[in-house]
């Protein structure tokens, strides 16, 4: 699998002073059907002001691209079938697309969310899957998007799926999503060290995350640490 990103994301200012942020990045060489589908859906836009444009670029678009990169490494590590690996990367590139339907004031909030706000944010998984289905994406992609916040112990959302009942691709995205959030940080939480990320993943292995995927991610993080010394 090629380890290159093709940027389909732009921020174009309109006459109304708002920016339209394309929310997808293309991965690999752009020749696969999923990348073409991604490219054809460049009109998935989020109108925002200049400050929000920078925020969405970093915490939404760039995050999805990084998660896709981690998913590609997991797929390679476990020798995932090429077709499934392609689906995994496409789903990862779009896993948070439902957040375009979440009010910016909630999505961008720096403090702790209220219970009501958290319920709103939780809707992004279902909204994203529904939206992608309506735009012609296959069930393999939409199901991974819908279930990437399920927990291995069954305490996640939206359907409370447990263990192997959670689609494998969703289980992989869940770990990669969390790893990136900790390694890079969020707007409301600073990044932490690789050791702390590993400790946190292992602490939640078997409860929040698939233990097998966690073990692979730990190996990847350790290898990255060696490479970047």
Regions found by a protein language model. Name each.
Residues 8, 20, 44-229:
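Histidine- and acidic-residue-rich, metal-dependent catalytic cores
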Residues 2-3, 15-16, 22, 31:
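Intrinsically disordered, low-complexity polyampholyte segments enriched for Lys and acidic residues
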Residues 25-27, 218:
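N-terminal regions of proteins, emphasizing targeting and processing segments when present
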Residues 40-42:
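Short, charged amphipathic alpha-helical "coupling" segments at sensory-output junctions
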Residues 28, 32-38:
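Cysteine-cluster motifs in flexible loop/terminal segments that predominantly coordinate metals
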Residues 9-12, 22-25:
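Serine/threonine-rich low-complexity intrinsically disordered regions
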């Amino acid at each position: 699998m090629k380890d290159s990103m093709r940027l389909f994301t732009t921020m174009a200012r309109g006459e109304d002073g708002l920016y339209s942020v394309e929310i997808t990045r293309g991965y690999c060489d752009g020749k696969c059907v999923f990348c073409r589908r991604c490219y054809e859906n460049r009109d998935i836009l989020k109108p925002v002001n200049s400050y929000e444009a920078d925020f969405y670029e970093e915490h939404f678009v760039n995050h999805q691209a990084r998660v896709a990169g981690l998913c590609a490494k997991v797929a390679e590590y476990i020798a995932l079938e090429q077709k499934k690996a392609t689906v995994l990367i496409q789903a990862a590139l779009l896993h948070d697309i439902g957040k375009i339907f979440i009010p910016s004031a909630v999505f961008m909030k720096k403090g702790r969310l209220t219970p009501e706000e958290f319920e709103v944010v939780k809707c992004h998984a279902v909204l994203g899957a529904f939206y992608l289905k309506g735009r012609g994406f296959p069930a393999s992609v939409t199901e991974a998007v819908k279930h990437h916040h399920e927990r291995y112990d069954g305490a996640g959302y939206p359907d409370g799926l447990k263990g192997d009942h959670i689609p494998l691709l969703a289980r992989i995205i869940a770990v990669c999503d969390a790893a990136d959030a900790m390694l890079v940080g969020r707007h409301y939480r600073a990044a932490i060290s690789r050791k702390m990320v590993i400790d946190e993943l292992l602490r939640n292995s078997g409860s929040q995350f698939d233990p097998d995927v966690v073990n692979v991610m730990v190996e990847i993080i350790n290898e990255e640490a060696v490479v970047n010394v």
